[in-house]
Amino acid sequence: HGMTEGNLKKRYIGTTDEDLINTDCLKGDYPKCERVVASPLKRCIQTAEYIYPNVDIEICDKLKECDFGDFENKSYEDLKDNPDYQKWLDSNGELPFPNGETHEDFKNRCKDGFFESLTERDTAFVIHGGSIMAIMQKLFGGNFYDYQVKNGCGYEFEMRNGEIVDDYSPIGCG
């Protein structure tokens, strides 16, 4: 999705429903599609409407960003002296977010939402950075953070009958 105020201020923005603040990062080349699936949060819907103005948007709740719990809408500066945050950092992000989602539950939710949304039609998924990383790791392996993307960026790959038939390539970020 495009840039939000929380992204600009480097906050953990998961369940907070923020609007886009600009579309500058959405000037890249995006693949044509017959359908769009998006997270229900405004930043994804607004991005989908901007990139694909003539395509109906289908909503998938399971593709929402992670629930960051007590870290939600806070920055590193806000959290750096919090012992729970330090424990989470020391775990390489594997510990559950206090009063939020576990990393594994989040990744499984995103994977399930992705596969439930697949059809034989060319589909663009307009979702969150964390959701992209979760799906890519589940599909292609490797480290979760290997798939980190900037706002407006993502990956393109081909699947048939639920199977990957082509390696991924980066998209967006003109």
Segments (PLM) and residue ranges:
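Acidic, His/Gly-rich catalytic cores of divalent-metal-dependent hydrolytic chemistry
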Residues: Y168-G174
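Short beta-strand scaffold positions
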Residues: A38-S39, N108, V126-I127
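Generic beta-sheet signal
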Residues: E34, T119-G130
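Short active-site segment of divalent metal-dependent hydrolases/proteases
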Residues: T4, S131-I132
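Short, acidic/turn-prone active-site loops that include or flank metal/cofactor-
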Residues: D17, K62-E65, N151-G154
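Phosphate-handling substructures
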Residues: I51-R109
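Domain-level recognition of soluble alpha/beta enzyme cores
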Residues: G142-D166
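Active-site-proximal alpha-helix that buttresses catalytic centers in soluble enzyme cores
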Residues: G2-V55
